[in-house]
């Protein structure tokens, strides 16, 4: 076998007949499979042991030679080689076809490769191959045209006319093979190149296509006649097995049926040829052989598929590769693994952040080999077999050994669907009773897990390296930040939030208000004995709290609550005391108003202070982010555990419950609804009188009911009691929002009908009063639509992620600095007046290209090529800078990837990115993972305001990434200049916009109803939109440069996500956009050997040009091409990656003709062939590293030993 990690590339070509013979171990002559009595393979059949190898290890067919000592001997009785049975997975056979047969991929694919090579239409080819027409192969002296087609009757007439033997015409694949042999590639290519200089239109397109195929044959050394088969390979029998089922019946792979058909027809044809049967019978048999081979290669590609029992189409070789169940996606990219288990998850509130609970029974099975090794090592039993019995019996002694074996041996937990890298994390196992895995509550958000019956899978990393990587890179305590936006992903939720909210509440006039404590212990004692309440405002001496006080705050009394003293006790000492939930308090310290000189009246001072709001979920998130910024992961994960414990403890003590009495009643609800009914009545009257249109009436009615609901909501908020449990849950961010509250206490409001339109009849009741039957029925529409939308959205979002991963999987950080001289100019992204993404956020974590100077003083705020921190970014924005040039993925010069400086910070760690990080995959996951949160609907703007519906949500993201023509397209100007006039033309219901510039004048026709973005006298630049709507990116690319298209796409994606409240780092979108504009189309080849019209990678294009320019030739010119992600994935340089994505047969057909080489640069292609992936520690620069001595330590000759030393060593030994 080839060593997988040794070879550099993999090539695919057409197989010549000699190549097929060299693979084969013998010819399959009979259609038999196995003997039904002996169940042994038949001689010369499809499972023959002579050809394919023995069915049992080290044993020939007749049983003369058994055992490994006869290895390599060929039995003289039965002719079978004595070897391992697994050779039946790799040895091939062949069938000598009695008539040539065309390969359906090359004749039927689009475009037909055979047709292009011969310059014949696929229709004509089909007629010839399936014996419906003759083709002239050699006209000799007759006036017949070479390659002309004639029917049987015409053929006979021509024979009569010109005499037998005056010309050669044949039918079937044989004729095509003869024609293919006649093709002179060099001459044809020269002719086509000449033709291209003058050709236009359809003729030109066809010439470019033909040239492409012929050039592929010429350069790859494949011969066109190999597209017709004379010899058919037979794949190894263990790849098309026959398995005996219970009850003596057999289940066989469909391929055996298909091969059997081919052999039967081939043998019959041989017999007919021997008998010199009439031509028409032989012809029919040849056609049937052709059809049998077609079905074997790709059943159903032409005509009706061959079916098995129950009219089920048989699975051919092509089907074995295609689709989710095909070889690529089922077996090569996603394998099932050993050392894994799965179980229901339960919550583990007592676990540390890096731990998970594993049931004992599961652990003993997962760690069985480790336990067995340890049993033998301890001499409990003598051999592995006995150890295995011990484990299976459940001997008492194994549990202690198991405890030791799993110590410091991390396991991986995975929850499907794995939408981003946080879907698999490593934990240290803790043995527990029961049968459910225990999961730490804080990692639930990353997994999107809950405990309503979710299941999770567990995997054991085996090798030392795998364990080290799991511990260092994947431990759950390390995953504090979300890779999509760099914000903490492990924020406390639900009970934890509620507990800390309750803990930090303040109440005026509670028992013990104004007491002063000398330290925390005293405060806690007073609390336990009932002198004070958690919410009581008290004083405590600042000297007793180890916090960073300012000079003026030392030796004072701090006015706070008992709860806040407890809350601050779990915080790191270096963090300011948290007295109020503000950023100022968090970053700068406690405001001075909370401090009092000792001896002053504290009660008075406390009553003068306003009550602070408690700490909510958002505030806890800010605290965690700040602590992460200061102390990194270890301290943060410890703090999170303390926050969790505190939260659970106090939410239990608070004992908050929800009852129907907790839902308040709005006194004047009836009046508000009555008013709205009257307004609706008036609106309907106006409509009946014809004063307003139906659309306007509908909009007014729905607006009126919305207003009524909002009025009720406002009343609720105004009258809410801060100690009401529902209000507390809502306000703290633990669960629920104002909309839930107003449906419980106000009114449910308007509902969506099944078609997505809002119904005019609102639901006037709330859940406390209960709904009427009709209202209940209405509300089911909305609920059902919600469920179906979610289901559809999940599938759509998953498919989007898959396409994104595929297009960017080979984007890896390959070097430190690419040395590019280009940068990206960034400003805040806005939409009209609305801020989408501020400059500050876009700047953090990026390297500057040029230094940033203060606009007024000219002082350098940030030098060039420096990683911008949050503080720097804030300083830049505060100085009034509005645009900055940064290093960007879009302008990076690294081949097959990105450099560290152009990428910037790794959002998941908060540090500069490392070489080897698979940033493409991370980008794809970051964009795909929130896909399910985006809406599905295309918004209808109520018929009046706009001319078109603007797509939003998930469909818009797909539209952008697939570079489709958008719905509601904006008209853009191709001229830079001034809008001179906008004229309305009533007859055609259009408007004309005139733009005058220095280079000329542009006239644009826009629909009458379109909303204009410009007015007369406005200055517009090239590519600016004249009307509202989305710009078509391909159109923009034709008018502007590549960078402006990339910037536009980036801004558009951000608009969709930010409008739905999802934050994604720019760099992820940049990675994707860059992959969409990687290709150029050659317009003029110059002196290069490129072909006109070829689509190629921009790096390959610059290479070809560099070589020509060095030798003094004319370089080629090309035009950038914007491709959708699906197209870009299929056009990737790796045929393995493309074939495993979509359109498998087309990709492989094309790659084989070109003799493509896959250099295995991406992740997918390496996974497919089982090579270590070139990312992370799999990169070449990290392999085979040797430890090096940094500095040598000088060795001291004499050692002085003191008695203390001796004693201490002794005590160590005795311990």
Swiss-Prot record:
CC cofactor: Mg(2+); Zn(2+)
**Superkingdom to which the source organism belongs:** Bacteria
**Free-text remark on how the cofactor is bound:** Binds 1 Mg(2+) ion per subunit. Binds 2 Zn(2+) ions per subunit.
Any one GO molecular function term = DNA-directed RNA polymerase activity
Q: Which GO terms describe its biological process?
A: DNA-templated transcription
Give me the residues that bind Mg(2+), please. Answer: 450, 452, 454
Quote the catalytic activity from the record: RNA(n) + a ribonucleoside 5'-triphosphate = RNA(n+1) + diphosphate
The residues listed in the UniProt record as binding Zn(2+) 1, with positions renumbered to this chain, are 60, 62, 75, 78
Q: What Gene Ontology cellular-component terms does the record carry?
A: DNA-directed RNA polymerase complex
Q: Which InterPro entries match?
A: DNA-dir_RpoC_beta_prime, DNA-dir_RpoC_beta_prime_bact, RNA_pol_asu, RNA_pol_N, RNA_pol_Rpb1_1, RNA_pol_Rpb1_3, RNA_pol_Rpb1_3_sf, RNA_pol_Rpb1_4
Residues annotated as binding Zn(2+) 2: 818, 892, 899, 902
- Keywords, sorted A to Z: DNA-directed RNA polymerase, Magnesium, Metal-binding, Nucleotidyltransferase, Transcription, Transferase, Zinc
Q: What is its EC number?
A: 2.7.7.6
Instruction: Describe its assembly.
Output: The RNAP catalytic core consists of 2 alpha, 1 beta, 1 beta' and 1 omega subunit. When a sigma factor is associated with the core the holoenzyme is formed, which can initiate transcription.
Protein family (similarity comment) = Belongs to the RNA polymerase beta' chain family.
Described purpose of this protein according to its UniProt entry: DNA-dependent RNA polymerase catalyzes the transcription of DNA into RNA using the four ribonucleoside triphosphates as substrates.
Protein name as catalogued: DNA-directed RNA polymerase subunit beta'
